[in-house]
């Protein structure tokens, strides 16, 4: 975004931000107000950056560039968009590092931009789309009120909570995007968790709220003796069945539409990945109690979540916590807060290990 804001030019921004007691042309240090203002301006530009990535994804521009560089006019013809504004969008995307502007309106994908293709492992296209879709975007408009009131204002933004919104037939496409985004984002985390988790003595696994089943299916691929199941809302389970069939695992897999607050199938192992952060403590206890009531003797649960670390240390979990406040009743938690939830639900944390991307696996045993 430096082409637009000029924020890399410290003396240039001094005309905008002002420099108390400093004449034009005077050298300034990074701690002086102009540089600080530039850093803040770039943070505020995150709103624009998210929309640029969302538009790239929706217009399939990275897919159109998959085979090599094209002009903005060629991309516009394929995308069905206006040539001049497509050029402006692609120019902005190049400032964000998503595209490489080669001159003469010609662009190619960068390594970052490749992640917005629809056909690559770990694709973030669905995430770019869902983050800029109404269910997320409208909720952020009420964020300050959420801070004032102490709880999400999603009902004010959407007329209902986020998961009710996704369950409505008219929002099925957005709900499917959300499920796909969660599955795509879990790739590295899933690999780390599968590598760290022992399935000795485990025959049956239930992926609680598992969307398209990426986690349990990866575990089944690693252990051919396992039978797996996904429990999720109706809009997600069809995708789980399709994914199991694609991987050749349908004979050991089933998907059940249900409500994890009410009842879960019996199993030796429950996978509860990035579920608890969507809910308040009482709701988390209810989910885990459902698992505790149904677990087979000697069974376990694996919870995978971000864990808030030491205060004052840069921590993605604390930023993600703001998204939880904006859109859900949930929160990111530290280990002490997790342990309180586990204990109240009849579990004890027996192991904790990093699984990638700032996420941790927390193995639970029934007590």
Labelled PLM ranges:
Residues 2-4, 19-103, 199-200, 204-367:
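Alpha-helical subdomain
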Residues 4-16:
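Short hydrophobic transmembrane-like helices used for membrane targeting/insertion
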Residues 30-31, 37-58, 63-69, 77-78, ...:
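Conserved Class I S-adenosyl-L-methionine-dependent methyltransferase catalytic core
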């Amino acid at each position: 975004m430096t082409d637009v804001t000029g924020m890399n030019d410290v003396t240039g921004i001094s005309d905008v931000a002002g420099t108390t007691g400093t004449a034009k042309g005077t050298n300034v240090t990074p701690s002086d107000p102009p540089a600080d203002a530039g850093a803040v301006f770039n943070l505020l530009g995150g709103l624009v950056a998210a929309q640029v990535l969302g538009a790239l994804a929706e217009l399939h521009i990275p897919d159109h560039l998959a085979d090599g560089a094209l002009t903005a006019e060629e991309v516009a013809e394929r995308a069905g968009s206006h040539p001049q504004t497509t050029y402006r969008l692609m120019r902005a995307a190049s400032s964000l590092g998503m595209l490489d502007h080669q001159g003469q309106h010609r662009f190619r994908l960068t390594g970052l931009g490749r992640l917005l293709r629809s056909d690559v492992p770990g694709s973030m296209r669905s995430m770019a789309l869902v983050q800029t879709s109404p269910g997320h975007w409208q909720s952020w408009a009420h964020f300050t009120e959420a801070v004032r009131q102490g709880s999400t204002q999603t009902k004010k933004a959407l007329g209902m909570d986020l998961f009710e919104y996704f369950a409505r037939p008219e929002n099925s496409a957005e709900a499917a995007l959300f499920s796909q985004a969660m599955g795509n984002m879990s790739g590295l985390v899933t690999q780390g968790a599968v590598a760290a988790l022992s399935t000795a003595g485990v025959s049956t696994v239930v992926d609680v709220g598992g969307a398209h089943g990426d986690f349990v299916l990866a575990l089944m691929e690693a252990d051919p003796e396992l039978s797996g199941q996904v429990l999720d809302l109706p809009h997600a389970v069809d995708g789980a069945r399709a994914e199991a069939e694609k991987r050749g695992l349908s004979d050991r897999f089933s998907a059940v539409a249900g409500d994890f607050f009410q009842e879960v199938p019996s199993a030796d192992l429950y996978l509860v990945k990035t579920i608890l952060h969507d809910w308040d403590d009482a709701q988390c206890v209810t989910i885990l109690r459902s698992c505790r009531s149904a677990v087979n003797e000697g069974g376990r649960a694996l919870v995978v979540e971000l864990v808030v670390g030491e205060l004052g240390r840069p921590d993605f979990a604390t930023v993600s916590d703001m998204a939880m406040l904006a859109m859900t009743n949930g929160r990111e938690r530290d280990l002490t807060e997790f342990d309180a939830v586990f204990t109240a639900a009849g579990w004890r944390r027996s192991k904790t290990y990093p699984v990638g991307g700032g996420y941790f696996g927390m193995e639970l045993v029934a007590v």
